[in-house]
Amino acid sequence: MASSINGNGFITTTVDELLSWGRRNALWPVTIGLACCAIEMMHAAASRFDIDRLGMIFRASPRQADVLIVAGTVVNKVAPMLKLVWDQMPEPKWCISMGGCASAGGPFPTYSTLQGIDRIIPVDVYIPGCPPTPQGLIYGLLELQRKIREKKVTRYEKAFEEFKKDLSPELLNGVGV
Protein backbone atom coordinates (compact mmCIF):
# COMPACT_ATOMS: atom_id res chain seq x y z
CA MET A 1 0.00 0.00 0.00
CA ALA A 2 1.41 3.36 -1.01
CA SER A 3 1.23 5.05 2.35
CA SER A 4 3.46 6.77 4.84
CA ILE A 5 3.91 6.53 8.59
CA ASN A 6 4.04 9.91 10.27
CA GLY A 7 5.82 10.79 13.51
CA ASN A 8 2.85 9.74 15.68
CA GLY A 9 2.75 6.19 14.28
CA PHE A 10 -0.32 6.73 12.09
CA ILE A 11 -0.50 5.42 8.55
CA THR A 12 -1.86 7.84 6.00
CA THR A 13 -3.22 6.66 2.67
CA THR A 14 -6.05 7.35 0.25
CA VAL A 15 -9.44 5.67 0.07
CA ASP A 16 -8.60 4.29 -3.37
CA GLU A 17 -5.39 2.70 -2.11
CA LEU A 18 -7.16 1.20 0.89
CA LEU A 19 -9.91 -0.29 -1.27
CA SER A 20 -7.37 -1.58 -3.77
CA TRP A 21 -5.37 -3.22 -0.97
CA GLY A 22 -8.47 -4.93 0.40
CA ARG A 23 -9.66 -6.10 -3.00
CA ARG A 24 -6.38 -7.56 -4.17
CA ASN A 25 -5.65 -9.38 -0.91
CA ALA A 26 -9.10 -10.95 -0.52
CA LEU A 27 -10.07 -12.26 -3.95
CA TRP A 28 -12.98 -14.69 -3.96
CA PRO A 29 -12.97 -16.74 -7.17
CA VAL A 30 -15.88 -18.67 -8.60
CA THR A 31 -14.79 -21.40 -10.96
CA ILE A 32 -16.15 -22.75 -14.18
CA GLY A 33 -14.23 -26.02 -14.50
CA LEU A 34 -15.06 -27.59 -17.84
CA ALA A 35 -12.16 -29.93 -18.64
CA CYS A 36 -8.70 -31.05 -17.56
CA CYS A 37 -7.71 -27.52 -16.46
CA ALA A 38 -10.21 -27.90 -13.62
CA ILE A 39 -8.14 -30.77 -12.19
CA GLU A 40 -5.10 -28.50 -12.06
CA MET A 41 -7.21 -25.79 -10.44
CA MET A 42 -8.26 -28.25 -7.72
CA HIS A 43 -4.61 -29.20 -7.33
CA ALA A 44 -3.73 -25.53 -6.74
CA ALA A 45 -6.35 -25.36 -3.99
CA ALA A 46 -5.12 -28.53 -2.26
CA SER A 47 -2.55 -28.68 0.52
CA ARG A 48 0.63 -28.68 -1.59
CA PHE A 49 0.05 -25.29 -3.24
CA ASP A 50 -2.65 -23.98 -0.85
CA ILE A 51 -4.13 -21.05 -2.73
CA ASP A 52 -5.86 -19.97 0.50
CA ARG A 53 -2.58 -18.52 1.76
CA LEU A 54 -2.98 -15.79 -0.85
CA GLY A 55 -6.31 -14.73 0.68
CA MET A 56 -8.42 -16.52 -1.93
CA ILE A 57 -11.48 -18.46 -0.92
CA PHE A 58 -13.37 -20.33 -3.63
CA ARG A 59 -17.06 -19.48 -3.69
CA ALA A 60 -19.89 -21.61 -5.04
CA SER A 61 -22.12 -18.69 -5.99
CA PRO A 62 -21.22 -16.00 -8.53
CA ARG A 63 -23.08 -13.46 -6.38
CA GLN A 64 -20.42 -13.88 -3.68
CA ALA A 65 -17.39 -13.84 -5.99
CA ASP A 66 -15.28 -11.16 -7.62
CA VAL A 67 -13.03 -13.32 -9.83
CA LEU A 68 -14.26 -15.73 -12.50
CA ILE A 69 -11.80 -18.49 -13.43
CA VAL A 70 -12.81 -20.25 -16.64
CA ALA A 71 -10.82 -23.46 -16.97
CA GLY A 72 -11.30 -25.61 -20.03
CA THR A 73 -13.19 -25.83 -23.29
CA VAL A 74 -16.28 -23.67 -23.65
CA VAL A 75 -18.71 -25.02 -26.22
CA ASN A 76 -21.25 -22.75 -27.88
CA LYS A 77 -24.13 -24.22 -25.86
CA VAL A 78 -22.40 -23.30 -22.59
CA ALA A 79 -21.48 -19.76 -23.69
CA PRO A 80 -24.85 -18.16 -22.73
CA MET A 81 -24.61 -19.73 -19.26
CA LEU A 82 -21.07 -18.42 -18.87
CA LYS A 83 -22.29 -14.92 -19.76
CA LEU A 84 -25.12 -15.31 -17.22
CA VAL A 85 -22.64 -16.25 -14.47
CA TRP A 86 -20.52 -13.20 -15.40
CA ASP A 87 -23.56 -10.91 -15.27
CA GLN A 88 -24.53 -12.23 -11.81
CA MET A 89 -21.19 -11.25 -10.29
CA PRO A 90 -21.06 -7.91 -8.44
CA GLU A 91 -18.68 -5.13 -9.48
CA PRO A 92 -15.73 -4.86 -9.34
CA LYS A 93 -15.10 -8.21 -11.01
CA TRP A 94 -12.27 -9.78 -12.92
CA CYS A 95 -11.86 -12.77 -15.23
CA ILE A 96 -9.04 -15.27 -15.66
CA SER A 97 -8.91 -17.50 -18.74
CA MET A 98 -7.08 -20.70 -17.78
CA GLY A 99 -5.63 -22.88 -20.50
CA GLY A 100 -5.48 -22.92 -24.25
CA CYS A 101 -9.08 -24.05 -24.68
CA ALA A 102 -10.62 -21.17 -22.71
CA SER A 103 -8.19 -18.66 -24.22
CA ALA A 104 -8.28 -19.66 -27.89
CA GLY A 105 -10.58 -22.64 -28.41
CA GLY A 106 -7.98 -25.36 -27.96
CA PRO A 107 -5.71 -27.23 -30.36
CA PHE A 108 -8.53 -28.45 -32.60
CA PRO A 109 -11.01 -25.62 -33.23
CA THR A 110 -14.42 -26.84 -34.36
CA TYR A 111 -17.77 -25.27 -35.18
CA SER A 112 -19.11 -26.15 -31.73
CA THR A 113 -16.25 -24.66 -29.68
CA LEU A 114 -16.06 -21.03 -28.62
CA GLN A 115 -12.75 -19.66 -29.93
CA GLY A 116 -11.82 -17.82 -26.75
CA ILE A 117 -14.03 -16.59 -23.92
CA ASP A 118 -12.99 -13.00 -24.66
CA ARG A 119 -15.60 -13.07 -27.41
CA ILE A 120 -18.37 -12.92 -24.78
CA ILE A 121 -16.80 -11.58 -21.56
CA PRO A 122 -13.74 -9.37 -20.89
CA VAL A 123 -10.63 -11.24 -19.75
CA ASP A 124 -8.03 -9.67 -17.45
CA VAL A 125 -5.43 -12.47 -17.27
CA TYR A 126 -4.67 -15.30 -19.69
CA ILE A 127 -2.89 -18.38 -18.35
CA PRO A 128 -1.32 -20.45 -21.16
CA GLY A 129 -0.85 -24.20 -21.13
CA CYS A 130 -2.61 -27.45 -21.84
CA PRO A 131 -3.32 -27.78 -18.99
CA PRO A 132 -1.51 -25.05 -17.07
CA THR A 133 0.27 -26.13 -13.93
CA PRO A 134 -0.92 -25.07 -10.47
CA GLN A 135 2.10 -22.76 -10.36
CA GLY A 136 0.81 -21.15 -13.55
CA LEU A 137 -2.58 -20.50 -11.95
CA ILE A 138 -0.95 -19.02 -8.86
CA TYR A 139 1.22 -16.81 -11.08
CA GLY A 140 -1.89 -15.68 -12.95
CA LEU A 141 -3.61 -14.79 -9.69
CA LEU A 142 -0.55 -12.85 -8.55
CA GLU A 143 -0.56 -11.00 -11.89
CA LEU A 144 -4.20 -10.10 -11.31
CA GLN A 145 -3.29 -8.77 -7.86
CA ARG A 146 -0.51 -6.71 -9.47
CA LYS A 147 -2.93 -5.31 -12.06
CA ILE A 148 -5.37 -4.33 -9.33
CA ARG A 149 -2.57 -2.66 -7.34
CA GLU A 150 -1.39 -0.71 -10.38
CA LYS A 151 -4.99 0.07 -11.38
CA LYS A 152 -4.58 -1.39 -14.83
CA VAL A 153 -8.04 -2.89 -14.58
CA THR A 154 -10.42 -0.16 -15.74
CA ARG A 155 -13.59 -1.75 -14.38
CA TYR A 156 -12.20 -1.22 -10.88
CA GLU A 157 -12.47 2.55 -11.15
CA LYS A 158 -16.02 2.40 -12.50
CA ALA A 159 -17.16 0.27 -9.58
CA PHE A 160 -16.42 2.92 -6.96
CA GLU A 161 -17.93 5.97 -8.68
CA GLU A 162 -21.07 5.83 -6.52
CA PHE A 163 -18.95 5.33 -3.41
CA LYS A 164 -16.78 8.34 -4.25
CA LYS A 165 -19.82 10.59 -4.74
CA ASP A 166 -20.77 10.12 -1.08
CA LEU A 167 -17.34 11.09 0.25
CA SER A 168 -16.10 14.56 1.00
CA PRO A 169 -13.33 15.99 -1.22
CA GLU A 170 -10.91 16.00 1.74
CA LEU A 171 -11.18 12.23 2.11
CA LEU A 172 -10.74 11.64 -1.61
CA ASN A 173 -7.52 13.64 -1.68
CA GLY A 174 -6.05 11.77 1.29
CA VAL A 175 -6.45 14.62 3.79
CA GLY A 176 -7.85 13.46 7.10
CA VAL A 177 -7.47 9.73 6.51
Swiss-Prot record:
Mind telling me which Pfam families this protein's record contains?
Oxidored_q6
The keyword 4Fe-4S is annotated on this UniProt entry: yes
Fetch the InterPro entries from UniProt.
NADH_UbQ_OxRdtase-like_20kDa, NADH_UQ_OxRdtase_20Kd_su
- List keywords of the entry alphabetically: 4Fe-4S, Cell inner membrane, Cell membrane, Iron, Iron-sulfur, Membrane, Metal-binding, NAD, Quinone, Translocase, Transport, Ubiquinone
Q: Where in the cell is it found?
A: Cell inner membrane
Q: Would you say which domain of life the source belongs to?
A: Bacteria
Task: Tell me the Gene Ontology biological-process terms attached to this UniProt entry.
Answer: aerobic respiration; electron transport coupled proton transport
Disulfide-bonded cysteine pairs: these are: none
Q: What is its EC number?
A: 7.1.1.-
Signal peptide per UniProt: none
Per the entry, the cofactor note is:
Binds 1 [4Fe-4S] cluster.
Q: Which residues bind [4Fe-4S] cluster?
A: 36-37, 101, 130
Where does this chain mainly localize? Answer: membrane
State the Gene Ontology terms under molecular function.
Answer: 4 iron, 4 sulfur cluster binding; iron ion binding; NADH dehydrogenase (ubiquinone) activity; NADH:ubiquinone reductase (non-electrogenic) activity; quinone binding
PROSITE patterns, per database record: COMPLEX1_20K
Its membrane topology is listed as: Peripheral membrane protein
Q: Which SUPFAM superfamilies match?
A: HydA/Nqo6-like
A single GO cellular-component term from the record reads: plasma membrane
Co-factor requirement: [4Fe-4S] cluster
Please write the reaction equations for the catalytic activity of this protein. Answer: a quinone + NADH + 5 H(+)(in) = a quinol + NAD(+) + 4 H(+)(out)
Q: How does it assemble?
A: NDH-1 is composed of 14 different subunits. Subunits NuoB, C, D, E, F, and G constitute the peripheral sector of the complex.
Member of which family? Answer: Belongs to the complex I 20 kDa subunit family.
Q: What does the UniProt function comment say about this protein?
A: NDH-1 shuttles electrons from NADH, via FMN and iron-sulfur (Fe-S) centers, to quinones in the respiratory chain. The immediate electron acceptor for the enzyme in this species is believed to be ubiquinone. Couples the redox reaction to proton translocation (for every two electrons transferred, four hydrogen ions are translocated across the cytoplasmic membrane), and thus conserves the redox energy in a proton gradient.
Which HAMAP family does the record associate with it?
NDH1_NuoB
Kindly provide the name given to this protein in its UniProt entry: NADH-quinone oxidoreductase subunit B
Native species: Hydrogenobaculum sp. (strain Y04AAS1)
* Gene name of the record: nuoB
